Regions:
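Membrane-interfacial helix-loop-helix
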Residues: 1-30, 54-128, 132-170
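Short helix-coil transition sites and intra-membrane helix breaks within transmembrane domains
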Residues: 35-44, 115-123
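Hydrophobic transmembrane alpha-helices of multi-pass, membrane-embedded glycosylation machinery
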Residues: 47-51
């Protein structure tokens, strides 16, 4: 099983590298957009690390990754807003949803910014969760973009620091 997982990761890294080499800034945007909608498809941190290791302009990486992640997050937010509540109620129940809404109403802005900004954690669930609440879509986009920019800056910086030590990863 371990060998299968390692081969799978290597395959994703290879395709990700080729995609970013061929499409640069646009490749980063598209990969981040896709991973925000389907989080298991492409790890967002790997996209940024690959772009930095491939010498894509760091400012463009930050812009493309933040815009791609936020745009994809908006799709997830909208899908959940339009039809996710009945599905969520089946899995976690009305009482838990109400508790979550109250908690999110109190701390939601912080949750969105810090949840989207934290590197090496899945920030995409935040968009889907926010869609279950009453948060204004414009507020969500602004907060999600702020968090995505912070995350991108942190990952570009860390990737640049470790680039010399990890030439064989991607």
């Amino acid at each position: 099983m371990y060998i299968f997982i390692m081969e799978f990761i290597q395959t994703i890294n290879t395709y990700l590298q080729l995609f970013i080499e061929n499409y640069g800034f646009y490749g980063v945007f598209i990969a981040m957009f896709i991973q925000a909608i389907i989080p298991v498809a492409i790890p967002s941190d790997a996209v940024i690390i690959a772009a930095v290791l491939l010498n894509v302009n760091p400012i463009l990486v930050i812009i493309a990754s933040a815009l791609g992640s936020t745009s994809g997050g908006l799709i997830g937010f909208t899908l959940t807003r339009k039809g996710g509540k009945p599905i969520a109620m089946k899995f976690i129940g009305k009482k838990q949803i109400e508790r979550f809404e109250n908690w999110f109403e109190r701390w939601g802005n912080y949750i969105i910014v810090f949840g989207r900004a934290a590197p090496f954690l899945s920030s995409d669930a935040i968009a889907f969760a926010a869609g279950l609440t009453k948060i204004n879509i414009k507020t969500f986009v602004i907060l999600a973009l702020i968090g995505a920019v912070i995350r991108s800056i942190i990952l570009v910086y860390l990737s640049d620091l470790i680039a010399d030590y990890l030439p064989d990863i991607i």
